[in-house]
A protein has these predicted regions:
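Feature captures the catalytic ectodomains and active-site-proximal regions of enzymes
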Residues: 1-362
Length: 362
């Protein structure tokens, strides 16, 4: 049983374990240690790695905002739509873009199925059969939805209890802590309260009612895809405020606000370097993409000709709580700035927890 808690970094879960009785009991009964996330440290990249067992270069899902040359568009990969029209969710699919051809490596579900192990995925109801689920979970045996936290834990318990005589891998994803951390900032009262409710549901709706026979031989894994770092409004860099920087770029930055992929105009490399050094020293690091690839930042594989255009010429990596946004204009109902974010390489973003505990031992 793998429960993935979006944006719950290693330090966050460790601190909660000092106060929460359920988590403290699990920590004492199991094994708990930090892992490093993928780069960029963001959900779509990490979930694809979890469900394929491949590094980002191995599966090709390299960021939240990507240039797709075959479609001639910069796409928002959460909405699966052009960035300029991301409100038209999944419009790429209407153009004939196929999720199964975007990530082509075999999925975890297929490998487990070949070994006689069934897989069940629990995710938010609107995501059960959407385009992203067709990427992440395309080989899963069953996809089941939930409405909220309570039925997530109940559905998870029922799935485990019904499969006592079978080998089973079940994965549940919960994203509320990530959403609250984006809006209010990480490690705030809002995100801490949400995480306490996660643990309360784990105890009351999953662990306590789970029959002893279902606990036997069941391993619970609690993990996360990435952490978050505070990104205060005063640390935002708006590209629209830097026309000289805009002039050096062929396209708007892609990737992540804290790990941007830059496509540079011919003859503008030195101008770009000078501008970043003069205006963003101590806030961003400019790194040639080829150097990042050689260093294995995206994984040990070499990029295929189809993947390399997705990465641009340079990476702009945030060092502190900065982020690079295109403009100050936001849609109606959106917060002016996300006060927590991820994507870069700081410990708060990259260190994630793994708690492993046998349920017949608690």
């Amino acid at each position: 049983v793998l429960v993935l808690l979006d944006a719950v970094g290693y330090g966050t879960l460790r601190r909660l374990g000092e106060a929460d009785p359920t988590l403290r009991r699990l920590l004492r009964a199991g094994r708990f240690f930090p892992l490093t996330s993928v780069f960029p440290s963001t959900t779509v990249v990490a979930l694809t790695t979890i469900w394929t067992g491949r590094a980002p270069l191995g599966h090709g899902f390299l960021g939240t905002r990507l240039l797709l040359p075959e479609q001639g568009v910069v796409a928002d990969m959460l909405a699966l739509a052009p960035v300029a029209h991301k409100q038209d969710r999944e419009s790429l699919l209407e153009w004939g873009w196929e999720p199964e051809r975007f990530v082509t490596v075999p999925g975890l579900g297929k490998r487990l199925s070949d070994q006689g192990i069934q897989t069940i995925v629990l995710t938010f109801y609107p995501y059960v059969n959407n385009g992203l689920s067709r990427i992440f979970h395309r080989d899963a045996g069953k996809r089941r939805g939930y409405v909220g936290l309570s039925d997530l834990w109940i559905n998870l318990r029922e799935a485990v209890a019904r499969s006592q005589a079978e080998r089973l891998f079940v994965n549940a994803y919960w994203g509320e802590v990530d959403a609250l951390s984006h809006v209010y900032g990480p490690d705030t009262e809002h995100s801490r309260s949400a995480l306490r409710y996660v643990m309360r549901g784990l105890e009351e709706d999953f662990l306590a009612p789970l029959p002893a026979s279902a606990r036997e031989g069941t391993l619970l894994l609690l993990a996360a895809d990435h952490g978050q770092i505070p990104t205060p409004a005063e640390r935002v860099v708006y590209l629209s405020d830097h026309p000289v920087l805009q002039e050096t770029l062929l396209l708007p930055p892609t990737g992540e606000p804290r790990a941007s992929f830059l496509y540079v105009q011919p003859g503008q490399v030195e101008r770009l370097r000078s501008y970043i050094a003069e205006h963003f020293a101590g806030r961003f690091v400019l790194l040639e993409t080829d150097r990042a690839l050689a260093a294995g930042l995206f994984g040990p594989e070499r990029p295929t000709p189809a993947l390399r255009p997705r990465l641009g010429d340079f990476l702009l990596l945030a060092q502190d709580g900065s982020q690079l946004l295109l403009t100050k204009k936001w849609g109606a109902g959106k917060p002016p700035v996300l006060l927590g974010h991820h994507g870069s390489l700081t410990p708060a973003e990259m260190l994630v927890p793994l708690l492993m505990v046998r349920l017949d031992g608690v």
